[in-house]
UniProtKB/Swiss-Prot annotation:
Residues binding Ca(2+): D149
Name of the protein in its database record: Probable endonuclease LCL3
SMART domains attached to this UniProt entry: SNc
Protein encoded by which gene: LCL3
Compartments reported by the entry: Mitochondrion; Membrane
E.C. numbers: 3.1.-.-
GO MF annotations in UniProt: endonuclease activity; metal ion binding
Length: 283
């Protein structure tokens, strides 16, 4: 509406100011907008080309590659395997295990403490193999020698087989405290790992333990309907030839081959199993 003529200019100005102040008080204050220029200005301020210079890039790449390479080497070659059940399937028929013999169970099996890397990794001069039963518990790999069957010792109420003690003593003298290399093939039903075993009598002259036992007449070639393991046809032929020669010479357990009570280790175990089954059925 039009202002009355007697209204002064000061009143008009006051009204205008009041209306403006009231309207401005009703409006909500707006927060200042964040400028996305902050990050851009920061990133632009960094001299990224400095990191692409060969003097900085090459050492970084070399250091990263070295760390990754060292990790791979440790994981593949220097990581210790505590027990036979911890052996990765990728090892079987592909890799060998180096270790020190801690005990011999009977004529064809024993335990080793895995020493990955051998002397180059410090075993024997910087790192010691434990000797106490407490330290060795759950820390040794149980190995079954592949391709051979030694005469049985007395155990589980069963009698000892002829030449069982001789085979056991021979293996103790040949292996206890020695470094061996085992070419692993597969686990057996007793949580052992079946392997061809080489013992180091001298630094560069490994000896095939299974083959030597056959030559001495202290074991026969492993005979079973299933589960026989030699590591290949060539190895099997070598073992059978050694057994045939020992048999021909009448060495070890072959001395009494012509007698009526002669039994191979396989026949002895089969007879003992039949006796045990007969006892179970009678009870």
């Amino acid at each position: 509406m039009r202002w009355l003529f007697w209204a002064s200019d000061n009143d008009k100005d006051g009204c205008k100011c009041n209306s403006k102040s009231s309207s401005s008080s009703d409006e909500k204050p707006t927060a200042p907008l964040k400028s996305n220029k902050d990050w851009n200005s920061l990133s632009n301020a960094i001299n990224w080309s400095h990191y692409a210079e060969p003097s900085n890039l090459i050492p970084t790449v070399l250091l990263t590659s070295g760390i990754l390479f060292a990790f791979r080497i440790h994981r593949r070659y220097l990581r210790r395997i505590p027990e036979a059940t911890n052996i990765s399937p990728s090892y079987l028929r592909q890799r060998s295990i180096l270790g020190k013999v801690t005990s011999v169970g009977d004529g064809d099996n024993f335990r080793i403490y895995h020493t990955p890397g051998g002397m180059l990794a410090g075993w024997g001069w910087l790192r010691k193999v434990p000797t106490s039963k407490k330290e060795l518990k759950n820390n040794t790999i149980h190995i079954r020698i592949a391709g051979v069957d030694a005469p049985e010792l007395a155990h589980f109420g069963r009698p000892s087989q002829p030449f069982g003690e001789e085979a056991h003593k021979w293996l103790i003298n040949r292996l206890t405290g020695r470094r061996i290399r085992a070419y692993v093939y597969r686990p057996d039903q007793y949580s052992r790992i079946v392997a061809t075993v080489y013992a180091y009598r001298f630094l560069f002259f490994p000896q095939d333990i299974g083959l030597q036992m056959l030559r001495e007449g202290l074991a026969t070639v492993y005979e079973a309907k299933s589960g026989a393991e030699f590591g290949g046809p060539e190895q099997e032929k070598k073992y059978r030839d050694a057994e045939a020669l020992a048999k021909k010479k009448g060495k070890g357990l072959w001395k009494t081959k012509g007698s009526n009570d002669w039994e191979s280790p396989r026949d002895f175990k089969s007879r003992m199993n039949a006796i045990d089954q007969g006892k179970d059925s009678s009870t």
